Each structure stands twice: as structure tokens, then as C-alpha cells.
Amino acid sequence: MRGLRVLSKTIILFFAALLLASCAETKYVPDGSYLLDKVKVTVDQRPEDVSTAQAKSYARQQENVRWFSLVKLPLGVYSLSGRDSTKWMNRLLKSMGEPPVLYDSALARLTVTDLQQMLFNKGYLDSRVELWTRTKGKKLSTIYKLYPGQPYQIGRLEYRIADPVINDELGLEDSLNWGLKPGSQFRVEELDHERKRITKLLNDRGYYRFHKDFVRYEADTTGHQVNLKLVLSADKTGEGLDTLHQRYKIRNLTYESGSRQDSTIHLRKKVLRESTYIKENGYYSGSDLQNTYNHFGRLGAVKYTNIQFREVPDTTLLDCRIQLQTNKPSTVSFQPEGTNTAGDFGAAATLTYQNRNLFRGAENLSVELRGAFEAIEGLEGYSNSNFLEYSLETRLTFPRFILPFLSADTRRRVNATSEVSLLYDIQDRPEFHRRLWSAGWRYKWVPSAAPVQYQVDLLDINYVLMPWISETFKRMYLDDVSSRNAILRYNYEDLFIAKVGFGFSYNNRRTALKTNVETAGNLLQLFSSLFEAKTNELGQYKIFNIAYAQYIKGDIDFTRSIQFDYANQLVFHVGLGIAYPYGNSTLLPFEKRYFSGGANSLRGWSVRSIGPGRYKRTDGRIDFLNQTGDMKLDLNVEYRTHLFWKLDAALFADAGNIWTLREYRDQPGGQFRLKDLPEQIAASYGLGFRFNFDYFIVRFDLGMKAVNPAYDEEEHFPLLHPKLSRDFAFHFAVGLPF
């Protein structure tokens, strides 16, 4: 009941603030002027290619920002300020708030013109736009009513090419090569696309001087049809020649340093050649020019690229000069940081050496030395309570595929990197010491001009060694029959994982999709079977006297955002992961198991404090080891809004859980069963604040449990029976959750 009273007071204060803000909205609106209260767009008959959201974006004036699309609180904050600008409080309120948007009739008329042009460009040549206004006191709302009418179609279509050579190049006698199609809807943007298509095609075939102004249209309308004639004008400078537009070839190709202090280009000639699509004695190509810029631009060793062409007088030849300025090859950085792990505070520092041009081929070498210290609270019976960690990680990245028998042309066509990494990590805790060796070889590549990325982990080896475990820890957790379990024991044994994986990601700003599949132990299992290797008492094969892990794991992560205006956005997220141990393993390695709760999952719970399924400890404490699973589901929705300055806010709701695929004695109620799914789904809700500093985002999320599958009766529905001390969780994080 106390939590319900706190929640009720918060809601009352929130709505009181909204009422106060709305009452003061017109404080700074001069007499004779109006506050632009609302901008609305309606579309008659609602054709598919004319949306109200798109049309509203053409409005020259938009109303003041509404928090969560409901209330103009920034305007209210501004209106709470006084008129005395010498007082700091008034200046603060004005800087935090937003001044009123005053209605401007001239801008409204320009908006009508813009909307009419937008409809015309889409083929609605008989459209009209009406402007309506409504006033109430000092507030005014505008309504733009769009009447598109019947769209026009392309009727007759004719290509008239004055240059016979270009006419043959384009092959326009065959209508299959036309970018425009008779019978399709007339759209100005399609006409412009056709001009650009023809221009690009000719630029790529050597027509260096050709530009889209040589392409124009002649049109006449009959009924609801537009008859088009595409005219390609001649280049008058070429009169008397076989072709009126000349094709240019590259005569000389030279490289030079773009730095005045250093005349040397610190890149091998082979790297220069493979990065350059422009070829001597080849025809000029605009695409080759852009690809050359792109290829040099992604080399970390290159700071600046400038490509210039010079026409050789009285010829159709070009001299190409490529200027390159390289970055400083070596850098050293030092980064201290504070740490907080489950309330235990500490400090860490990282020293990084980076060489961006190791072998004069833009290879990137990174050597990172990290040290960390943490004071652990609440440990009894141990000789010390400090956690120490030291790690050395080396990464070498090549800006291309490192594969045998791969042609230079194939390497150039794909934006790829090859990476080899080595890691040695030392962890000394009061309870145990752990050593980790890791080695990996992976490829990443991006197809040309595509918002997708692929990754292949050709080999990823992890070797975990537990050289020492304290007698106290063994006695309390590993040897005590009442407390030990298979997951706990497996987590503190030596471990060997040799995995391969494949990942795919797609991101076009509004939609993001990430998938990843990995598997481990299959090749080792094959060799063990072929050579009839011996097994241990559990029937497991070993390598280096360690039973290696064997499993398959797949993850998919999908995010979709809907932008209402520049200040309001709705974001949906779905995450699903499944991992299955088999063959040489009956349990997943702890590092590969799923957990839920925390800043990026169910935000009503702290990290690793929910699931699997309906599992809970009898003493009510968090069980970091047992609250893991083989399967995870995350369903999230956030309504994000801009508040003021660099502060954003979000209302969120989360649902999901983790499960085991098998029934484990130590995790009762944790196995996934489809018929029990409704009772096993957890849910939470809350409010978040985010400071957006452009380069990074600092996030504070306040979550409350809504449905808790670990309990029955009243505790199963904290949404109806809230208790702040039991159901509240606070999260601090850097970056957005999805």
C-alpha cells in the first residue's frame, strides 16, 4: 500500500506540472499575435503515396515540442520565467525551455505552395491545397487540407538522342533499357532519376564532360496523361566529329603526398594499386573515381585523399593525380576508469598502443594492457577481500581479405577486414584464481553500397585454467552436498572452447537486424571419434586433459523505430537466443549461458536476478549461477522524447525471461514448456532519463516490476500490488538499450 501511495503522489504531481505549464503557455505571446497551437494535415481519399506525416514535414512552421506527444512542457518551463533577464533563475528557465512559436501567415502561404508542389511532383497535376485556421483566445491552429485528385500517367514516351554514338551506347531502341515506362504514374522524381541514370551510365563509359543538364524533357498533357519526350542535347564544342560527346581515356596516373612537411607516401605500391580503381589507358569512370575515394577513405593510415583530373590540350586524354596524406602512424593512450560491480567499487586503467600502418599496408596493430582493482564487501573466511585483474590483448587488423587464391579484383570489390587477436587474462579473487588464454581469426566484410555487414569467426579458441581455489570456497560451495550443483561445479573447472561462427547485421537507421550463429567442439569430436580417443568417467573426450565444450547457439535481435517528429520516437525491440549443449557436453559453458534483468533487458530487475522460468531461491536471495539459462526472450517498447538542452526521456515496457531446455534438479521450474509460457513471462515498466552528449549517451532508467513469474497470488502481479522496496530497480548505463 505504501508503494501505491508513492505512485499515486507521483502521478498527481506529474499532472499538476502539466496543468501549470499549460496555463502559462501564452504569457510571452504579444497582443495581436497568436501562439501556433497545432499544425494538422488532412488528405482527401488518402492515396498510398501521400501520407499526412510526410505532408506535415513540409510545414514551414511547427508547433512547440510536446513531451511524449502530449504536453508542451518546454514551452511551459520557458513561460515560468520572469521578464527580468538580470536574474539567473529567469535565464536558466529560458535556456531550459522553448520560446513560443508565433503564427506567421506568410510562412503558412509558403507552406501551401510547397504542398501543392509536392503533390505536383507526385503526379497530381490537378491538386489543390486549402488553408484553414481556428483561433481560441491567443492560440491558433492551422489545418492544411490536401485534395490530390486523380494522378496523371505517362502516355507516349520518346527518347530523342542527337548523338548517334551515345544512342548506340544506351541501346534505347529497346524499351527494356528505358528507365521510364509508359502507363506508370507520372512523378517528377522519376524523371530526375532517369536523368541521373543516363548521366551516370555515360560518365562510367568515358564521357568525362557529360552532365545531367544535357538531358531535358518536353511534355504535353491530354486527359490524365503526360506525353514525354526525353531530349539529349549535343555538346556544341564537338561539332564536326563522329560523336558530339567525347570519350576520355586516362593517359597518366600519378601519386603524390598531400603533406607539405613529408613528401613520402608511407604505403606500399601494391596497396596503392589495389586501392585505385582508375586505370591508365582505361576510359574515365565516375564510379571508379568514387570507389577509389571510398577505398582510400577506409584505410586507417590515410587521413586525406584528393583526386584531380587535367585535360590534355587538343586530345581526349586525361592526366590523373592522386594526393594522399597519411596519419601519424603510432599513438599511445591512457584511460582510467571507475568500476562498480554489484555494489563493489574499484578502479581500472588501460594503456593502449596503436600503429595504423604496421607493414606500410594500413595494417592496424593494437596492444592493450589493462589492470583493475576492486574491494569486495561481505566476504568472510578468506585471507583477503581484494580482486585483481591484469590482461594483455593484441589485435592485428588487415584492411582486406587475407585468403589464398583470392584475386586482387575480388579483394577490391568487397570492403573487408581480416583480424587476428591474442589475449591473456589474469584474475585473482579471494575465492579462486583464473587464467584465460584466447586466440581468434575472423573476417568482416560489407558489400558495396549496402547497409549490411557479415562476420565469420573462422576460429575462436578459449582456454580457461583454474590454478587455485581456496579451501573455504571449496568447503562452502563445491564440496558441501547441500549447496553444490552441476552448474556451479562446471563454472569452476578448467574449460576449453574451440568455436566457429557466422554473423549478419543490417541497419538502415529505422530498422536494425542482427543475427549470429556459433558452434563449438564439432571438429574436435570428429577427430576424437576417428582416432578412437579415450574418454573420462563421464564419457567425455578431452584435449590437453580438459573435456572440451560442444554446443550450438543462435541469436537474433530486431529493432524498429517510428519517428513521429524530431522530438518523439517509438522504438520496438525483439531479442531471441537459443543454445543447446550436446555430444561432449551436458551443460553450456557459463560464459555462453543467457541471463536476464539489468539495463538492457527486463529493467524491473537487477542483472541476473530473474528466471529461469519460475525458478526462485527459497531464501529469496539472488543466485547468479542458477539464474542463467539456455534460452532467452526479450520484448521491449520505448517511447522516447526530447525534453530540453541535452536531456531526453523515455517511457518503457519490457517483457521476457530466460529458460533451460532441459530439466535440471538445481533449477526447478526453469524448463521451457510452451503450455506454461503465459505464466512464465515477466514484465516491467518504467521511466528513463538520457543525457545525449552526441558522442555518447549517459542513461538512467527507473524500472518497476509488473508481472513476476517467480511468485503466486498478489506477488505475481506487482503492477496491481506495488511495493517500492521489492519491485523497484535503478540502472545506470552508457548508450541506448537497443
How would you describe each model-predicted region?
Residues 1-11:
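Bacterial N-terminal signal peptides that target proteins for export
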Residues 2-3, 24-340, 370, 552-556, ...:
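Periplasmic polypeptide-binding modules associated with outer-membrane biogenesis and secretion
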Residues 19-22:
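C-terminal motif of bacterial Sec signal peptides marking the signal peptidase cleavage site
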Residues 137, 150, 313, 508, ...:
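A generic beta-sheet turn/junction motif
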Residues 166, 170-171, 265, 285-514, ...:
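Gram-negative/organellar outer-membrane beta-barrel architecture
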Residues 296, 353, 396, 515, ...:
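Hydrophobic, well-ordered secondary-structure elements that form the walls
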Residues 339-342, 455-641, 651-674:
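C-terminal outer-membrane beta-barrel translocator/porin domains of Gram-negative envelope proteins
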Residues 649-652, 697-703:
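Conserved active-site loop/cleft motifs that coordinate metal ions or position small ligands
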